[in-house]
Amino acid sequence: FWSYKLKTEQLIGSNIKKVFNFYATPKNLNLITPPFLNFKILGNDYEETEEGRIFIYRLRLHNLPVFWKSKIEQWNPPLKFVDKQLFGPYLKWHHHHIFEDLGKETKVIDIVYYTVPFGSLFHKLFVKKDLINIFNYRKESLNNIFNS
């Protein structure tokens, strides 16, 4: 199995409390997820996130239906939270959301540790490109929401 790390950073023109609260509201994930994924949160319609909370999503990857179950493993508002995939397309997925207080701005750092099935060629041909596109869309969406 092949393990990888993806890291992105973004400066958002809003204070850390507002930015963290945006991330802590599950329905906002729909606003920063590309439409091509047909992303939908299933089950409980939580207003906010907390440690131990489990979320189930449905999406489409390359036109294939995918179910994803994740758990909030760490919750340290307004500085950090970590979600872990319990079931889904990856063999392993740990997503660290880190927020740095810069006064009137916030630096958002995403670090994802993940393991893919089917080896490095599958990662190179599909997964890496998909993740870059997804996180680029997220950056653009966050810019439109906070920096407009």
Regions found by a protein language model. Name each.
Residues 5-7, 65-69, 92-95:
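Short, surface-exposed coil-to-beta transition loops
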